[in-house]
Amino acid sequence: MIIDANSLYARSWFAAQRVDPDPPQALRLAINTILLLLNPNTNRIGSHFDRTLFCWDGAQNPNKGRSEKPPEYHQTKEVLKEILTLLLGTAHAEHPHYEGDDLVATAVYASKADHIYIVSGDKDLMQLQTNERIHYYCLNNKAVLSTAFINQRWHIKRPSQISVALAIIGDPVDNIQGIRGWGPKKVQRLFEDITPDMDFGSVVQAIDAKIPEEHKASFYESLERTLLNSDVPGVPEPAPLVLVDPKEVAEMGLTSLQGAYREVYHIYNVEPF
């Protein structure tokens, strides 16, 4: 399991916040989400996991235009990383010049595992999904998305083409302009002649032929930002899952999570699978 840690943590942070930040509650929500995902009885996957890797933003793209997080956000993030390491023996990936989704892509393509589950709420990472071994678990839907679902949602023929679709319609969340005035229906028409067996370069070339010259600069500028970098140096392999004794959970100040943790510990350390 390779986790887009910033996506998971940000959701927990803002869900915990009412008026003022609530770091302890944010920690509990983030850790509880991971415990639910590790438990085959609650993860809606029905599968166990033997290795984990959490990928964090080391740099924020200034083009996204997002406001700076408060100091407590970053301090709590470091506490969460430490707790996850103690609880699960997990590995963490972070690079000062790259965002977490690039680290996820690098780790996914480097892995030789039979099945890889990407955990994220970021639509950009859907482009890594394949029918065979790479699966996208959506934190928003709380389920693994099928390839057919992703293709239908974005009007494409393969998940790897999401970057092209986003370069056309834009993405206000990441401040990506796209082609002004072009939306999902335009993507659907542009992809009518695209087939699932076409390689990525051929897809871009075919779409390029249908884009008026005055829009091509916007398209390629946006495409450069929607593509994932899968060659980030120094990304570690996912680490074997090693769970601490449940008695130690209370000592970490996580008393409310003891029950959920104990169940996961029992499944992985007592029950055969």
What is each stretch, according to the model?
Residues 55-57, 240-243, 260:
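A cross-family glycoside hydrolase active-site/sugar-binding cleft signature
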Residues 234-250:
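C-terminal domain-closing interface element
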